[in-house]
């Protein structure tokens, strides 16, 4: 029996009156008891999910491209796990939308690339093309223009299966590995995720292998014209790239003509450079870059280079992929990566705010584990732009030593600093802050993994139709760094803090909100910045804060909550971003209002009321929505932990501030 059920519940009338008290600004004893019970139930449920090692880890779900690619990988290599394939196929079928295709997030519009991969995966798994669900999918794909309209990554996957000619994908020869740093394109100029995905892809796209495809499955029926006849594979690059895009596409076509002239010795040297780059970063059972697309490309590249299936490195690379699987009784899917450091740091902040002995003990166990995960003197790609900077960051995953990120590092240092045992973590915090400040970009902002990764023209190359080749500074990451720098308040960080605040002020949208690069969307970005402003001493009456608060108030729903969909990332659909309330977005809004002098507002208490009303009997909250972009407009995520720890954090923070106000 869960602990909330052991207590005597108030009558329905008493609870309704108590909630009315919340809305009318009075934290009565009855309301206080209800709030305490809600917080205790959420806290106990979260503590119960902490691992023995001290970390929290919740599922991280992506759209159907990832599980579809897992099936395609098995057929590329002819290493098919039939029971697993059957379960992944069941997952894909269950996520087909009413429009016949597959969206990038639940409830989203038809997406061509996701639909093509899901259809192909199901056909590879043995689904009859004439089955009703396959016929519906095929009709939706053809209505959208056919598989030729897929994005670059999907077209490369199809080329590897011989489904379209290689002229239908960008020219990315392995000789890119030999280019000097001053050249207009170099690996150092793109993001970590682009590097780790592209380097093994250079090998694949240069060797141009054909998948083993043991069942000889093809999808010519998804093309409106025969793929060998199709001449319009780069239509989107021409439409969206402008003059620069057309020039770069012309360079791409010219380069193909030169390819036969490349000396064999140069090709061999470049291939070996790419191979060694991958092997140096293979990262054990955590995988290249600790992200699925890079890991798949690495495994397939190793196979093409002649590594036998029992080679220890290839076995380890395959095991890294298998560890991403979430396998249930009747279905299975593959995660894009895992998020233990992020989940643990945020859950720890919620535990600290909830403030009881059990919470603080759980937080200490979590911080002790986090301390062991800090990356200090390990090599990392970030050092290419900051060669003299000492390490001190944390990665997002269990193991990803080449790629610590600033967001995780800021949140971990924040939690460590506000611990009752902060002295135990002082050296870890010092190293973290030194590293964060050293990673500030020239414009004053902070990016996720790199500094000054701002060669924006590269987003116009034919390969970059996803628009996410780079890792520039963002408001949400900058806000997190500002929060921890201001909270700790070291004198030597004042200049960096001042520059970061200037950056945040400059990034405010005309309507008062901030864009959320790593969480959906303007509610997330606005919460992040308002928390940072509060820590940095930007007062509630500041004009930027007032505009942000006014925007938040205008987005509150009639049920007291807040909600925003991933369609808010579409440039022409921003007016649609207000949607059904969610627990995590309501929690962000509540935390933002608490940080902005709105502790006595009706809006705040209505938000708290929404969170209490939607809490489940097990103490947690449930929500089906995807809550973050991997890449806006291209790839979205559902952090299953967000509805577990963010509402707890918000309720506990509301209680703390309410009691502080009452005591005064």
Describe these PLM feature segments.
Residues 1-664:
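Preference for long, amphipathic alpha-helical scaffolds in soluble/luminal domains
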